[in-house]
Amino acid sequence: MRVGIGYDVHKLVAERQLVLGGVVIPYEFGLLGHSDADVLIHAIMDALLGAAALGDIGRHFPDNEPRYKGISSMKLLEEVREKLAVKGYSVNNLDAVVVAQAPKLAPYIQAMQQNIARTLQVDLDSVNIKATTTEHLGFAGRGEGIGAYAVCTLQQG
């Protein structure tokens, strides 16, 4: 059994779609980034890569690489799953939390879990996504950005 942890944060800006867990969420701001800036998927990818001792997303998907400009992070997650499979790993369990003051994410959690489970080719009950606020404290509480943490376990075979 291997354990990984991931973290990511992106700035909220106008004129960008907000994408979390592969779900487009109606909101006046979106996350700034080279790809679609899906902070949840980025944290998950870092956890998965770390558990397999494969480095981090910056190593595999550098933000100065033109082919990743605007790419769906779900596509990158699929590539991470393939990298894990090459090393003989599969996802046993994934738990993640999105830290955002707004918007409310509860209505979208199930769709996020379904997208992630489908992409990782695991049962839905192997993926848990939560959302929390910071009670108006820090950058997330001021609405300047959104962060995400993820923990995973991998198994061989």
From Swiss-Prot:
Residues that coordinate or bind 4-CDP-2-C-methyl-D-erythritol 2-phosphate: 8-10, 34-35, 56-58, 61-65, 132-135, 139, 142
One Gene Ontology term of the molecular function aspect: metal ion binding
Gene3D superfamilies, per database record: 2-C-methyl-D-erythritol 2,4-cyclodiphosphate synthase
Catalysed reaction equations from the record: 4-CDP-2-C-methyl-D-erythritol 2-phosphate = 2-C-methyl-D-erythritol 2,4-cyclic diphosphate + CMP
Cofactor: a divalent metal cation
Subunit structure and binding partners: Homotrimer.
Name of this chain's protein: 2-C-methyl-D-erythritol 2,4-cyclodiphosphate synthase
Species assigned in the record: Desulforamulus reducens (strain ATCC BAA-1160 / DSM 100696 / MI-1)
